[in-house]
């Protein structure tokens, strides 16, 4: 019964986050007998702002723990977001600071999170990527800004 409750809780928590599409990975080291370290790129659309797509690159630790999810990935990432369609969302109705994407980077409590912030005075949406842990996070971070522009028809 506890297991069923945990699965249901995880399903509810993941409803609001965007789902990423993996685009590919590039090896950054060569390990002869185990999986290589690599950098992987994923894409996701902002679930509340249709017309904005983001791409995130993240370092992935190789080694023998990698196939089992036991490695803790480093907190190295980059994010780039762009307007790719007309945006009709009223910025004043968006939450001031809302998580739009999260991805586990360790089997034990480490997560990359992306938050959306709204800069109403500049008509811009800011995306902030950070890494969190249960006890402490990392000062590593990255941002991408998307000025909302008129879209040609």
Residue ranges and their predicted role:
Residues 4-13:
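Sec-dependent N-terminal signal peptides
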Residues 21-74:
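N-terminal secretory signal peptides
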Residues 26-34, 44, 101-104, 112-120:
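Short acidic-hydrophobic surface loop/beta-edge motif
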Residues 51-118:
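Mature extracytoplasmic domains of secretory-pathway proteins
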């Amino acid at each position: 019964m506890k297991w069923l409750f945990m699965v249901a809780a995880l399903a509810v928590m993941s409803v609001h986050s965007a789902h990423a599409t993996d685009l590919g990975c590039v090896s950054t080291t060569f390990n002869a007998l185990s999986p290589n370290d690599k950098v992987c790129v994923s894409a996701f659309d902002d679930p509340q702002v249709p017309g904005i797509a983001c791409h995130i690159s993240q370092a992935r630790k190789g080694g023998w723990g990698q196939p089992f999810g036991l490695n803790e990935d480093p907190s190295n990432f980059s994010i780039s977001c762009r307007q790719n369609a007309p945006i009709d969302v009223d910025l004043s109705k968006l939450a001031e600071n809302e998580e739009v994407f999260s991805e586990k980077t360790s089997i034990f409590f480490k997560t990359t999170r992306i938050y959306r912030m709204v800069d109403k005075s500049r008509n811009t949406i800011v995306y902030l990527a950070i890494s969190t842990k249960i006890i402490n996070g990392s000062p590593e971070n990255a941002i991408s800004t998307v000025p909302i522009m008129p879209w040609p028809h």
